[in-house]
Amino acid sequence: MGGRDLAGLPSRVERFIGGDLGQVEQIFRQELDSQNPYVADIFAHVAHFRGKRLRPMLLLLAASATGPINEAHRVLGAVVEMIHTATLVHDDVLDEAETRRYVATVNARWNNETSVLFGDYLFTHAFHLASSLDTTLACRLIGRATNIVCEGELTQTRERGNLDLSEDAYLRIIDGKTAELCAVSCYLGAHYADADETVAKSLEQYGRTLGIAFQISDDLLDILGSEDQTGKSLGTDFKKQKLTLPLIRLLSQTEEPEAQRLRELLTQADDEAWAEVVRWLHRSDAVEYARNRALEFAAAARSHLECLSNSAAKQMLVEITEFATQRSY
């Protein structure tokens, strides 16, 4: 594994499915084209921070690994990207984030009201586009997945400041808010390639466990990453008192009287407290523990690919599990 060029993986995936990914992008832009100059200006801005396009990539790779890519896949790739982008726009409001992908967030450039409404605009367009397919299956599955994403975000909001949050509860939250959309992307890719239902379900589980590995890694980057590399505001989880896996582990391994001091720091949520918490993290096994858990979920994701025949698409799905836990952005 170690000799692979994982940093160049996104570019290699783009070259492999480039024509189809380009058509996904075209459908995405056509669906969101607006004659309203204000809306068009917001969309042009959002296009700059849409990121890795992981979910449409997963959908297209799942399709390529199980059968030919067709027009339904390209439409669905645009749909899942719209859903994901909507969640980013709304997340930035919840986190009061100021930058994403090196540019100002919608809430920073305009205001929270504009962010909420534009996120809603993306959601409605996603379902409008999904309804253009011949059957209602995709619309129903994506609707269900979006409901689960929202439930995950609502649960995380409810649990802010809960210093007794368990690892199991944390995993349930990220399973909903992050992994669900990866799972449905992979399932739809396989299903619309006429894959056997058993294979489609295996790819769904691949997407789910991969999504969990990605989110744990994201949570580590929020603590240890560099804003120059990630291109987004960091430390937002701490400032919003959202307990993530490294902090859950640190709390579970800290005994009194130190535990009381740690809890005080976690409730202060300012820069000085954050600097001290980071020092605590580095003195503990919390970072290593979280990394190992991410690696475990990545390995579980790879195991769900065993049902696939060898192909370039399968190999890229394997490498994405490695990229998920080794990336710096």
Residue spans for each PLM region:
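All-alpha prenyltransferase/terpene-synthase fold signal
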Residues: 1-329
